[in-house]
């Protein structure tokens, strides 16, 4: 069992686009697309990342707490760890893109809600204006 050194995480040196790509490929399945946690084990196994500091993110990546896999320097370089931390901080600080937030899911869910309400109203109008035979 190899012990990894806690990386020095500097979000200013990280790449936001690389961080997003790494997050989607390695983290989103458990922590959720918005880093809210709860995708696995209701937040007990994969907690929300909203309060994690960049150093805590780097430490978690290297040590793999609980069932989380460890990402050593051969899997993620210091630059990649900083990029991941930058993206996670960006997720937390930039709120809900795409209008009114519905559980931080964004405009796809809003469009779905609009369709459901629109179709419901259309059904009511058809029902009220229709004739009985």
PLM feature segments, named:
Residues 1, 34, 40-96:
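Extracytoplasmic electron-transfer domains, predominantly the class I c-type cytochrome c fold
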Residues 1-5, 73-130:
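C-terminal capping alpha-helices of c-type cytochrome domains
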